[in-house]
Amino acid sequence: MADKKGSNSEKLLYCSFCGKSQHEVKKLIAGPSVFICDECIDLCNEIIRDEAAAAGVEASLSKSDLPSPQEIRDILDQYVIGQERAKKILAVAVYNHYKRLKHLDKKDDVELSKSNILLIGPTGSGKTLLAQTLARLLNVPFVIADATTLTEAGYVGEDVENIIQKLLQNCNYEVDKAQRGIVYIDEIDKISRKSDNPSITRDVSGEGVQQALLKLVEGTMASVPPQGGRKHPNQDFIQVDTTNILFICGGAFDGLEKVITDRTEKTGIGFGATVKSKQERDAGEVLREVEPEDLIKFGLIPELIGRLPVVATLGKLDEAALMKILVEPKNALVKQYQKLFAMERVELEIRPDALQAVARKAIRRKTGARGLRSIIEQALLDVMYELPTLKGVSKVIIDDNVIEGDGKPLLIYEDTPKVAGSN
């Protein structure tokens, strides 16, 4: 765009792309007879990032150097603490799944079946984080669905095909990419049928949803309305083949240990039986002995269990594991809060006794790793409220008394220490 002259006779410069003047933008960068503003540069960067990410999905799955199970496990270790056996099972299953996809075009007498995954473990043990980390590592579209919100088609609530619509939305409605994505269905245990006998009455949010999910997990052509649209009989639908989508289902399965224990105690009778008291066997150890018949007894239909051949169990996180979760992963909570405080030019120190107190509190609440953030947030609330208006604070120290609510954070000023909230 040509330069225009202002009223004060000096040249006013304009962006050659959007036409905004130099006074309407933060920065105007000059080239040979053209100018570009900071807003247009940001927009160009965003377009390039989106296209690079889209190209990366295809590239990541077409490369011969698909991460090995060991490499997948190593990356999971950076984000997820503990659950070693579950990480190994997941690494092998995901590697085999995407290796299978790479060889789909090759003609062979042996057809490789898809191996979907079932994660069993208590709340806050890392089920969702494992699935999220896998999707990030493989650079494929990913969506989390809550099984408790699903109903059979035709009833009030979300039908199962909405899951595929969300997956499409996450990859800008590019069907090829969606067909190689990962779907994580959480709370799968909450749609178990009420008894292990087939239901006579209609169960639209339990067994009925399992039947609907069965087709999706097994592989079907899902009909999804166009971008931003709702289902209508007279409109064209986008057809998505779910055959090559990896489904990971997760749930706490509260009460499954009792089902397993009842079965194993019946079989473990006689002179050669190994006797262990209930106190000696923790829930994680019991869950590792899960069999398909236990899941059927719990309330999952046999057909759905058959479509989830890879079962990984996660144990309850103990105090030591929770303390590691607070500090060791790449995006550990303590590192996040230290970064927040660093933005105020203040150093945050959370002492080991405070970390231990946070872990103990999470165990008491039975929230696992999921409850750690709320405990720290509650402990730091007052100091985060006051800090932006306080002058000269260089460091904040948190001990176990702060976590338990019996004390206040210690503020270190450039001159002398002071307790938060004191005058």
Curated annotation (Swiss-Prot):
GO terms for cellular component: HslUV protease complex. Disulfide bonds: none annotated. ATP-dependent specificity component of the Clp protease. It directs the protease to specific substrates. Can perform chaperone functions in the absence of ClpP. Component of the ClpX-ClpP complex. Forms a hexameric ring that, in the presence of ATP, binds to fourteen ClpP subunits assembled into a disk-like structure with a central cavity, resembling the structure of eukaryotic proteasomes. Coiled coil: none annotated. ATP binds at residues 122-129. The keyword Lyase does not apply. Residues 3-56 form the ClpX-type ZB domain. Keywords: ATP-binding, Chaperone, Metal-binding, Nucleotide-binding, Zinc. It comes from the Bacteria. InterPro entries: AAA+_ATPase, ATP-dep_Clp_protease_ClpX, ATPase_AAA_core, Clp_ATPase_C, Clp_protease_ATP-bd_su_ClpX, ClpX_bact, P-loop_NTPase, Znf_CppX_C4. GO terms for molecular function: ATP binding; ATP hydrolysis activity; ATP-dependent protein folding chaperone; protein dimerization activity; unfolded protein binding; zinc ion binding. This is ATP-dependent Clp protease ATP-binding subunit ClpX. Pfam families: AAA_2, ClpB_D2-small, zf-C4_ClpX. Zn(2+) binds at residues 15, 18, 37, 40. Belongs to the ClpX chaperone family. One of its GO terms (biological process) is cell division. CDD domains: RecA-like_ClpX.
